[in-house]
Structure formats: structure tokens, C-alpha cells
Amino acid sequence: MQSPRNRRTGIGVFVAALLVARLVHAEDTEVSALVTPVASGFYTVMPCRAVDTRIGVGPNGGPALGGGETRVFGIAGRCGIPNSARAVALNLTVTGPAAAGTILVYPAGESTPSASTINFTAGRTRANNVVVATGEAGQVAAFCGMPPGATVDVIFDVVGYFEDATGNKPPVVAAGPDAALAMPANSLALSGTFSDDGKPAGATYAAAWSVTAGPPGVAFSAPASPSTNVTFAAAGTYTLRLTVSDSDRAGFDDLTVKVTATLPDVLRFLDQASFGPAPDQSDTVRTQGLSEWIEEQFRAPETGYPPLPPESGTTPAECPYNSVCYRDKYTTYPLQNLFFTNALYGGDQLRQKVAWALHKIFVVSGADIPMPSRLTPYLRVLNRNAFGNFRTLLGEITLNTAMGRYLDMVTSTRTRPNENYPREILQLFSVGTVRLNPDGTEQSDANGPVPTYDQSVVDGLAKAFTGWTYGTQFPGGVTNYIDPMVLVPGNHDTTAKLLLRGVTLPAGQDGTQDLNAALDNVFTDPNVGPFIGKQLIQMLVTSNPSPAFVARVTSAFDDNGWGVRGDMKAVIRAILLDPEARGTGPGAPSFGRLREPALWLVASLRALGAQSADGTANADGYLSPRTTPLGQNPLRPATVFSYFPPDYEAPGAGGLLGPEFGIHSATTALGRANFVNTLVYNTSGCPVVGRPCLRPNTDPNNLNGNTNGVSLDFASLVPFAGSLAAPDPAPLVDELDRRLLHGTMSAAMRTEVTQALNAIAPTDPVPPGDVLGGKFRRVQAGIYLVLTASQFQVER
């Protein structure tokens, strides 16, 4: 990669170039200069984004600038800008302004200038080339001249800097060219070089390799030498930095290494990060890269749950029980169907998967609040905050009216403070009942496990959360479940409250102050990272993560690398790109998780190209009647403790956790086999020959389902089934292994499946007596055997 210090020129030459550029700038680009006159040299850097308020909250990130706000950004130390820089050259972009305004950029610590750096109108993206002196600690300040309440995002792309032209210069470093590896190859030779100006006299040089971006698990054989070997534990895109010091100044250069995953690991990754790989998706993701796919998913438009108008809790005459109107407005039927169609076809697979995990932590059950208009705002909170900040999620879920109704906060007053929500936010939603180390292991003393809180903390939170209730009613006296709860000041307890870690809220605060302070107290507790992080690992990757895995995720929760706590994107990256989640094999025997019924069903359908019964459209999502007999009725968990407890021990597993085994029994195991039998062998009456189907609903009132039905695409598997001339079923077994088991089929299972398929002659269809043929029946048998096998039902 080209060295960041690759060109030097005089300041006058550069400013002259800016003046020429000013004469030819595009309509939405301006050029200005704000420079402290010094005897300087100008050094270019590879264009680098130093500030972007559109990304997660952080020192050089979001949120957007607000009207009247001044914010300071550190520039030195980023993008190859040394601490000695006197000024920086950058491109300033403003985007998404809510109103017309101006941005003033100037040295931090100095007075706000009167001249604007860039002017803009509402909704218009504009850019400006700027040279600005750096102030205190290499920082620049930005003032937003907009009306109060209006916001705008700003982006700083650095292209160069000025520094004193005399004295010692840092070494000029070249880390080497960018590189690519395809696993299982995971080692690379690095040959960095550097040059220096010979100052100071008698200088001694020290080199150091480091990792500035990418998954953990990188090892250098000689990290203090410019020439070294580097080994990667997992696929991903890595930025490696070579820094060289002359005992006074240091220079550095970066190179990028893209490590491509093996095909089995890509398929395993898609099982973890989505609702299962779809046909032909794996090659695309493998070429793209796992970390790049994650970032693309962060940007993907949300599918989710569209907002619904409010509905009365009293069923009107036109919605009698057992009518389509009643079904659609007073039962969870539409939301359950939407959950399954989002899971099957949504382009935002990662958001939907994380939101499903959050639903299992922050439980509101449709069994108690079945009306779609009332439950939808809760589901939208989960979707909206899946990639946001955990503190924001805590705040929005606390004031969500469905949650308030489900756990009784909506009726909690100073005279009757309710302990239900305070107890569950502690026990289930944030810190748990036992003090944890960062690696998720329990802390103990002479009395046993150390409790996280006692009854006095529950009492304190109950008082802090008093006074919140339903928002303004809609016409006709319809209760407001659409908007967050509102505060009734007279119903709030204004006495002092004891919170976690001995923190006391002072008396006299209003309800909003108490609620925010209480949530901050919960959010900043050191238990949140390991307690929530471990559960997310269990729901996405493995039921029994190692303490080291949990500790790495806790570290990402505590600090995203920008000093921000609770960044869900950082947590998701840490989980999915961790070496224990990635690699060429499933790891230890304890690795993996039982697929819960909803995920098992959707993964099966996605892998087999599920469409409508006639194969022309999406399936209708009417699948909850299929998972309910298996122990899981989606969006309707039986209690606030979710569908299954995260600390449930799998029977006979020697203490290993298996949360999903909490709803798995001999009956539900047989139910899975029966469902696969129906799914694979039901071809009678299906609209398309060769597409087994769950037939569309034929009820003229359409009370029990939509009309699309669901069918599977077996046509792509038939060519692998062999022929009478070449009857070996090995190609079909290999393809089923690749598509459903990610190449992990055991030798014993392969032998058994092969024997079963050999018993079926691979004949072609002979209508009218045999419209399917032996090849098709081989495919049916192979799919049945794999989908019902433990090796598929346990995701590894």
C-alpha cells in the first residue's frame, strides 16, 4: 500500500492549487482555506474518512450535529495525520440537512469565526474543500448554524496535512502491498520497509506490527520486525499497521489483507447471521467477504412490521369472532405470518435475526396482547434498535406501551409502585441475578454467588418508574398503544431512590429525570456486557461459548473502539467474526445449538427454495400451526421467561447448556419427523408436478391461512440423483451434505444415507403410472433423512 506520507510540497503551491480549483468547482462544491501562516511542508495522505456522524455514536461519529451545537473532533492520530500537524486539508460534506444553515469549521479552542465554511439548503448534499488549522490536541471544532431541533450529518475526508518543515521528520514507512488469502491457507509473509532523514543524531529505530481492524486471532511471528509472518484465525478483512519510530518521531503505513472463508464456514456463518443460507447464496457471500456482508446488512433497508392504525379493544359488530376481520385485527395471525415471510425472504436477514433474539430477551407475548395494532410498535422497537445502541433500546422498550401493559408499569403510581417491570429489567433484560466477571463466569464469596441486587434496589427502581401511563386516547376512546407512554407528574414518586451499586437518586427529581438516571444506572452496570452478550452468542452461534469468547464480546459491548458503550453493531461483529464462531470446522464437541422449531423450519425451507404452492410467488407465511405442535408458537411465548431459559441444561449432557432443549421432548422430536414427512412426500394435488407442497387453504372464508401455500424446489437436486447407467448416489449425498450440513456429514451418516438411496432405483418418470420417477424419490428420501437427522437439527 502506498505510504500515507507520499508527497511533500510548499504551502503556497497547495493554496494556489485551491484557488485555481475554486474557479472550476461544481455547483455543489466550494473551496475555502483557513490556515495559520507557518513555514510548513504539505504532505498528502491516502484519502481517509476521519469523521462521519452517520455511523454509530462515537468521538468521530454520530449523532448528527444539532442546530446551535459545537462539537470537537480529534484529527491528529487518525488517517496518518501526526500529532505535529499544524493544519489539515480535507473535504467537508454535509448531507441530510433538515433545514437551511451553515457549518463553521475552525481550530478547537479558538473563538467561533464569523465566516461560514459551507452553506446549504434543506435536503441538499454539499461538499467543500477546506484547509483548517488544528487547535488543542490536534482537534478541530464544527459549529452548526441551524434552527434549534434541526440536524445535519457531516463528513470529513482528509487528504493531507501541513507541519513544520524544519527539524526531525518521522520515518517514511511502507507496509507492503495489499494481499488476499483463501482459507484453509491462513499465513502470509510481510516485508515492510522504511526510510528516514537521519535525525536525530544517533537515532535507534523500533518497528511494531499491530492490527487496527478485523476479527481477533491475528498472530505475528516477529511483531517487532518489519519482515514477519502473520497468521489469521478466521476469515475477514484486516488492516495491519507497521509503525516505525526513530526514538523521537514515529511514522506508519497500513495494508489490507482479505481472508476468504471456506465454503463450509460461509454456510455456517449464514446459519448464524441469517435464517439459513438460500440456494446459490454462499458463493456470493464467500466472494464478498463475511465482514463486508455484515456491513452491507447494516445498511440494508428494514423490512420489519409496517405501522398499523389504532383499533378498539372492544370488537365491533362487523368483526364477529371467527371472521376474517377478527382474525386480522384481534389475533396475532397477521404478525406471525409476517414474521415467517420476513425470515424466509427479507433482504435484511441480519436485522431480523437479531430482532428475533432481542424478542426472546425483552419478552412481550402476543398471548397476552394479541392485537396486531398493539403489538406492532413493540416489534418495531426491536427492529429499529437491533443495530443501534443498547441504552436507546432500554429506553424505548421501557416506555413502549405494550411492555408497560404486559409488565404493569402502565399502572405504577407513587401510591402503588409496581415491582413487575423493575424486577424483570434487572433479572432478564440487563444484569441478571448474580454478579459476573467479564467472561460471564459467576463471582462468589464465602456465602456463595454474589447477588447483583436485593429487594431495596427493586423498590428503588419501582419508585423511579412511577407515573408513566397510556398516551392521549384516539377518537372513540381507543386506548393508545401506538405512542410511547407519557408521564403524569402527580403520579410520580419524588422521594430518594436506591439503585444498583449503592447509587442514590436524590429526592425532588421529576419522572423523566428519575427514569433516565435509573436506566443509565442499569446500562452502565458491568454485568450488562457479559449477561446480554452471552445470551446473544447463545442465540446466534453456540449454547456453550467459552469464557474467552464471552470476554471478547463483553469488551466490544463496553467499548466499540471509539469509546462508546452498548454499540450493537460492534457486539454483532464481535460475535459473528470471533474465531470460535469462524474456522474450518465446528470446533469442540460442545460447540453448536439445537435449532429451535421456528429456526429449524425456516432454515429447511430456505435451503430448499421455498415458494408458493405453484412456484410463482413467495410462500404465504402461514407456518405457526406447524411450529406450535413442536413447542414454539412464534410471538406468543408462554411467560416473560421466553420460550426457554438461557441457563437450561441439556438432559444427560454433563452440565452443558442447551436452552432450546427446554422445549424439546420425545413428542416434539417425533413431530419434527412427521412435519418433514408431510413437507417432502406430499405431492398429491400440488399445482406443479415435482414440487412437494403444503397445499393452499381452500376455505372460502380464508380463516385458517392465506392462499399461496408453500412448495419446495427439488428440480435442482434431481440431476445429482444418478441414473440407471451411473447409479451411484454419492453426488446427491455430497450435495445434500454441502447444502444442509455445510460439509460436516459424519462417515457413519454418509454410509447410512447412501445405503438407503441405493435401495431406490434412479429411474426417469414414466407417465401416467409414475409421474415422479426414481430419481425424484431418491431426492425425497435423502432430504427426509438429512432434515430429521441430529446433525441438521443441531446447528454447528
Regions found by a protein language model. Give the residues of each.
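N-terminal accessory alpha/beta regions
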Residues: 279-385
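Active-site substrate-binding loop specific to GH73 endo-beta-N-acetylglucosaminidase modules
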Residues: 286, 327, 335-340, 371-620, ...
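C-terminal edge beta-strand
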Residues: 251-260
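Short edge beta-strands and adjacent beta->alpha junctions
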Residues: 27-167
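Proline-centered linker/hinge motifs at extracellular inter-domain junctions
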Residues: 168-172
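Surface-exposed, flexible coil segments in extracellular/virion-facing regions
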Residues: 206-230
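Acidic, Ser/Thr
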Residues: 191-201, 212
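Flexible, low-complexity segments enriched for small/polar residues
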Residues: 267, 271-274, 525, 529, ...
